[in-house]
């Protein structure tokens, strides 16, 4: 096992950020904001079935994530929400539209997204038995605000800058509930994700939602070394609507019947791998807190090695290494590793960014749309998911992923050929 390396000196942002142009996005009408009083304890905390089903409460007997920093790259976290008071310790805006601390929820479509994500990762709850409590309630949050859409700053540039800022400002874990809706990524991301890898930061990304037309895991989760998170139903089956499939899925986490905090003090039920991802990010924070000697590769190895297999084939294209198990990830005996079992972006760059490198993207199979569905457009956005207000008197808000500019789709995975080779060695 390698000792956890010291954080490197800040590297400058790449002088030229090469970014793919965004496809025009279709914006849906703005929905009524979910500003409402905090719901009663039995309608929020008691709905968090994953705390017991996935060993999170048991893991809290060892640690609650103290001293670990999770960066949320999303639409801007409402740091004043009762469930997040004291959790957000800083942030930054890369969209050009948010406030300087990245804590202004940007909308209209994405206004709820980041706050929901943050609450599942490191929410404190509004009381001992009320509000949403995250998987790592003692971890801290950095909020990096993004804004995606036809009239916004280039999304690729925002993500690259946001990742580098997060690394340079103390993030131990980066949670990405967003996608390019393609398996490849721009060269500007090479610099950003390499910066995270070289500075010992765990990067976790969502595998996407088939319900939004994303049939195949997409970047940033296709980047080697990134832990891709798929979604399962309450019963532990791969979600038909809230999870994409791909050979690079790392672990599965709950993605249906979720509840999260929304700006203004309210809560909403929702589904999608946007929610599964921060749960895993919180569990990664528990592992980092319990095992401070581990580097990022060791943290990821503990998470995938202790996952509960669902099939006899591991990893499986639908379930990866299995269902996340927080208690085992924190406490089980796990063999040490010297390298990230999910690959290395540094090695990938060496192999595939040469002038004479093979064009691996054109040789990969295209995702096949489900029967009766149109393929998802090439678009950048945060994960679309169904969202229903919990507070009485607040109308339900339904978000249809690929039809919203700010909530197009979320996905995650790994470049297929490269990761297949890595896992078979």
Which residues fall in each region the model found?
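Protease zymogen maturation seam
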Residues: 2, 15-20, 24-67, 82-83
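C-terminal subdomain of the subtilisin-like protease fold in secreted/lumenal serine endopeptidases
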Residues: 175, 240, 293-396
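Extracellular S/T/G-rich loop segment that most often corresponds to the catalytic His/Ser-adjacent loop
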Residues: 221-289
């Amino acid at each position: 096992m390698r000792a956890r390396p010291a954080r490197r000196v800040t590297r400058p942002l790449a002088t030229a950020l090469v970014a793919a142009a965004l496809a025009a996005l279709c914006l849906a009408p703005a929905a009524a904001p979910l500003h409402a009083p905090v719901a009663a304890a039995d309608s929020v905390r008691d709905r968090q079935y994953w705390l017991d089903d996935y060993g999170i409460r048991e893991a809290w007997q060892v640690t609650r994530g103290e001293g670990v920093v999770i960066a949320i790259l999303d639409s801007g976290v409402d740091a004043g929400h009762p469930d997040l008071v004291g959790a957000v310790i800083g942030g930054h805006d890369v969209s050009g539209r948010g406030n300087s601390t990245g804590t202004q929820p940007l909308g209209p479509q994405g206004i709820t997204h980041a706050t929901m994500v943050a609450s599942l990762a490191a929410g404190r709850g509004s009381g001992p038995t009320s509000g949403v409590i995250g998987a790592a309630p003692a971890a801290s949050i950095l909020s990096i605000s993004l804004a995606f859409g036809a009239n916004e700053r280039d999304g690729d540039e925002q993500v690259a800058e946001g990742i580098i800022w997060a690394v340079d400002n103390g993030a131990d874990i980066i949670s990405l509930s967003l996608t390019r809706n393609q398996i490849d990524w721009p060269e500007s991301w090479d610099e950003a994700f390499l910066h995270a890898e070289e500075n010992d930061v765990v990067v976790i990304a969502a595998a996407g939602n088939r319900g939004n037309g994303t049939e195949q895991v997409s970047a940033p989760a296709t980047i080697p070394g990134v832990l891709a998170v798929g979604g399962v139903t309450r019963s532990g089956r791969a979600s038909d609507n809230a999870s994409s499939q791909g050979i690079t899925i790392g672990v599965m986490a709950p993605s249906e019947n979720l509840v999260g905090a929304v700006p203004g003090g309210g809560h909403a039920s929702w589904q999608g791998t946007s929610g599964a991802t921060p749960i895993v990010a919180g569990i990664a924070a528990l592992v980092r807190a319990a095992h401070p000697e581990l580097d990022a590769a060791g943290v990821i190895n503990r998470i995938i090695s202790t996952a509960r297999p669902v099939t006899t084939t591991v990893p499986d294209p639908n379930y990866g290494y299995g269902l996340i198990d927080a208690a085992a990830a924190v406490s089980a005996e796990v063999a040490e590793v010297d390298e990230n079992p999910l690959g290395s972006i540094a090695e990938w760059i060496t192999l595939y960014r040469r002038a004479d490198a093979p064009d691996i993207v054109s040789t990969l199979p295209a995702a096949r749309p489900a029967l009766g569905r149109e393929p998802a457009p090439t678009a950048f956005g945060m994960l679309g998911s169904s969202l229903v207000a919990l507070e009485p008197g607040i109308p339900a808000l339904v978000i249809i992923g690929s039809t919203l500019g700010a909530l197009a789709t979320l996905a995650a995975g790994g470049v297929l050929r490269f990761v297949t080779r890595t896992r078979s060695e």
